[in-house]
């Protein structure tokens, strides 16, 4: 009975022994010279040495480094800053507030004589990355900033063993831009960004333009604006004692007018030509005034929409604004003419005096022929001649007329009604002549006005854009 009990005791002790000795074996196998992980541990020794060299390099470089002092050997030495600009996105152009928002990278490179070392003394390290807050950086800012943020982001710099420091911080700028909306929406804008040192003059820090063209390799297109050209130039501002260098980048941007053409210009032109159709409606239709009033209200709404887009300035009036004002005057005149034509249409001998001879001559004889209308006189001439011919025989029969007074009375009454009806028809025909005359007049004015306003601007816009694109392709 003892043997089986001893066996159960050994079996119960087995798991305990595994829990004690197995971790020890794993640790021994991992860290021992024969373990599987021994090679990995020995492989980490080399990066550790590199890290020690880099730590030693940082300590030697920045132990006595003062980042507020210009890194020059002599006080009169000048630091030359190679400056370049790369644009990643044209975020927005705010015409109302006259601002241009951009995302850019500021490329800056200079020599820091305090950050030089021999790579052989530090394990072959040729460059290090240092936070920009830990070393001297030029205080180059955007002068024409509009939101109070004059500097870029605080990012790391790349320092080479020969002292060359490269710093490319990203920045989001809102720069002031004078917007000229004269040819809106076929407008080109010239917005500039002026960079320079905030405190150093040219004898201490000189700015050198690295590349005349702005780097647009990583540019993300904007849906409303297109950059036609972006070039930089160097300038100097001189005062009584010193000179201050600066770099100015000029961005020539053009608006993509398709959206405004489809949803603003074409509806305005359509409303303008819709006004012409008012004169095609009969004068006895009351919808003529309603149509004119509806067009006028629609133009007012378009004018309010444009007022929200363009800046409030009395110096220039945008092209589309001129066209809307022209169309509103056009519609107002059409309302006045329509009211006059309706008044003419409803005239009669009982409400107005007899028609003047010159009115009858011009509007019943001459204008209908010029307007390719059938003459109103021709329609009633045969009836009048028949009436006159019928009066002759009746007048020659005096005896019969005396006997037939009642018939004569009826005849005179019928003739009077006929004359009254003819007078009414004459006035209605004059109203038709006026409608036809104003139809062609307003159509001609609308076509000439639309072409006169938009064609020269589009032609000029196309002639400016095409040579610039050809020049950019040649580059």
From Swiss-Prot:
Positions annotated with a glycan in the UniProt record: 190, 236
SUPFAM superfamilies the record matches: Neurotransmitter-gated ion-channel transmembrane pore, Nicotinic receptor ligand binding domain-like
Record-linked Gene3D superfamilies: Neurotransmitter-gated ion-channel ligand-binding domain, Neurotransmitter-gated ion-channel transmembrane domain
GO CC entries: acetylcholine-gated channel complex; cation channel complex; cholinergic synapse; dopaminergic synapse; neuron projection; neurotransmitter receptor complex; plasma membrane; postsynaptic membrane
UniProt-listed Pfam families: Neur_chan_LBD, Neur_chan_memb
Extracellular face of the membrane: 30-261, 459-475
Disulphide-bonded residues: 177-191, 241-242
Keyword set includes Zinc: no
Entry keyword annotation includes Transport: yes
GO biological process, one term: neuromuscular synaptic transmission
Subcellular compartments: Synaptic cell membrane; Cell membrane
Membrane topology annotation: Multi-pass membrane protein
First-listed, main subcellular location of the protein, grouped into a coarse class: membrane
Bilayer-crossing regions: 262-282, 289-309, 324-344, 438-458
Activity regulation behaviour: Activated by a myriad of ligands such as acetylcholine, cytisine, nicotine, choline and epibatidine.
N-terminal signal peptide: 1-29
This protein's UniProt keywords: Cell membrane, Disulfide bond, Glycoprotein, Ion channel, Ion transport, Ligand-gated ion channel, Membrane, Receptor, Signal, Synapse, Transmembrane, Transmembrane helix, Transport
Any one GO molecular function term: acetylcholine receptor activity
Cytoplasmic topological domain residue ranges: 345-437
Function: Component of neuronal acetylcholine receptors (nAChRs) that function as pentameric, ligand-gated cation channels with high calcium permeability among other activities. nAChRs are excitatory neurotrasnmitter receptors formed by a collection of nAChR subunits known to mediate synaptic transmission in the nervous system and the neuromuscular junction. Each nAchR subunit confers differential attributes to channel properties, including activation, deactivation and desensitization kinetics, pH sensitivity, cation permeability, and binding to allosteric modulators.
Subunit structure comment from the entry: Neuronal AChR that forms heteropentamers composed of two different type of subunits: alpha and non-alpha (beta). CHRNA5/alpha-5 subunit is only able to form functional nAChRs when co-assembled with another alpha subunit, can be combined to CHRNA4/alpha-4 or CHRNA3/alpha-3 and CHRNB4/beta-4 or CHRNB2/beta-2 to give rise to functional receptors. Interacts with LYPD6.
Family in the record: Belongs to the ligand-gated ion channel (TC 1.A.9) family. Acetylcholine receptor (TC 1.A.9.1) subfamily. Alpha-5/CHRNA5 sub-subfamily.
Protein name, entry field: Neuronal acetylcholine receptor subunit alpha-5
């Amino acid at each position: 009975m003892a043997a089986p009990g001893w066996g159960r005791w050994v079996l119960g002790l087995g798991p305990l022994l595994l829990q004690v000795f197995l971790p020890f074996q794993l640790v021994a196998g991992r860290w021992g010279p024969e373990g599987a992980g021994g090679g990995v541990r020995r492989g980490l020794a080399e990066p550790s040495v590199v890290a020690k060299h880099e730590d030693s390099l940082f300590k030697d470089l920045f132990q006595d480094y003062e980042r507020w002092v210009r890194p020059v050997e002599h006080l009169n030495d000048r630091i030359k800053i190679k400056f370049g600009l790369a644009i990643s996105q044209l975020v927005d152009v705010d015409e109302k507030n006259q601002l241009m928002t951009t995302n850019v990278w500021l490329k800056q490179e200079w020599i820091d004589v305090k950050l030089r070392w021999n790579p052989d003394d530090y394990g072959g390290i040729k460059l290090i990355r240092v936070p920009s807050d830990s070393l001297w950086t030029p205080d180059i800012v955007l002068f024409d900033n509009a939101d109070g943020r004059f500097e870029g982001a605080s990012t790391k710099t790349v320092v080479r063993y020969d002292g060359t420091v490269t710093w490319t911080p990203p920045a989001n700028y809102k720069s002031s831009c004078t917007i000229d909306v004269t040819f809106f929406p076929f407008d080109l804008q010239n917005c500039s960004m002026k960079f320079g040192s905030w405190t150093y003059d040219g004898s201490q820090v000189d700015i050198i333009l690295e590349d005349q063209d702005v780097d647009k390799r990583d540019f993300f297109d904007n849906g409303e604006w297109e950059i036609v050209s972006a070039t930089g130039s160097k300038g100097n501002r001189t005062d009584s004692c010193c000179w201050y260098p600066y770099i100015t980048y000029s961005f020539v941007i053009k608006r993509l007018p398709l959206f405004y053409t489809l949803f603003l210009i074409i509806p305005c032109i359509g409303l303008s030509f819709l006004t012409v159709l008012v004169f095609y409606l009969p004068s006895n239709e009351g919808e003529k005034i309603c149509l004119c009033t509806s067009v006028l209200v629609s133009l007012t709404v378009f004018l309010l929409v444009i007022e929200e887009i363009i800046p409030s300035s009395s110096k220039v009036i945008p092209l589309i604004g001129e066209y809307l004002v022209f169309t509103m005057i056009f519609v107002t005149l059409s309302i006045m003419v329509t009211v006059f034509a309706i008044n003419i249409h409803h005239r009669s001998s009982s409400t107005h005096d007899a028609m003047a001879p010159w009115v009858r001559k011009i509007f019943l004889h001459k204008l209908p022929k010029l307007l390719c209308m059938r003459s109103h006189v021709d329609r009633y001439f045969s009836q009048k001649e028949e009436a006159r011919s019928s009066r002759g025989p009746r007048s020659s029969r005096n005896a019969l007329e005396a006997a037939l007074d009642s018939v004569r009375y009826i005849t005179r009454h019928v003739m009077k009604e006929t004359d009254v009806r003819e007078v009414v028809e004459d006035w209605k025909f004059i109203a038709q002549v006026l409608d036809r005359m104003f139809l062609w007049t307003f159509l001609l004015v609308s076509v000439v006005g639309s072409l006169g306003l938009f064609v020269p601007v589009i032609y000029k816009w196309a002639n400016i854009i095409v040579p610039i694109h050809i020049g950019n392709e040649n580059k």
